[in-house]
Curated annotation (Swiss-Prot):
It comes from Heterodactyla hemprichii (Hemprich's sea anemone). SUPFAM superfamilies: Crisp domain-like (SSF57546). Coiled coil: none annotated. The record marks 62 as: Key residue for binding both Kv1.2/KCNA2 and Kv1.3/KCNA3 (occludes the channel pore like a cork in a bottle). This is Kappa-thalatoxin-Hhe2a. Residues 43-75 form the ShKT domain.
């Protein structure tokens, strides 16, 4: 029974990671088409509170170390 629970949790975690990765890649493709691909990666001090959702904050942190210092300052 324990093994089945562990297997179920691992399967759910794997599925969630695949969904999140696919969503982030889809967002990057949309940015390329819209021309905002470079804007996202330019250094900004803060994200406006209107755009500061948990997903937006997490997604912008992806580029934090190589491009910016405080991309999610208002989150």
């Amino acid at each position: 029974m324990k093994f089945q629970m562990i297997a179920a949790v691992l399967l759910i975690a794997f599925c969630l990671s695949v969904v999140v990765t696919a969503r982030m890649e889809l967002q990057d493709d949309e940015d390329m088409k819209n021309g905002s691909f470079q804007k996202r990666r330019t250094c900004i001090d803060t994200i406006p509170k209107s755009r500061c959702t948990a997903f937006q904050c997490k997604h912008s942190m992806k580029y934090r170390l190589s491009f910016c210092r405080k991309t999610c300052g208002t989150c």
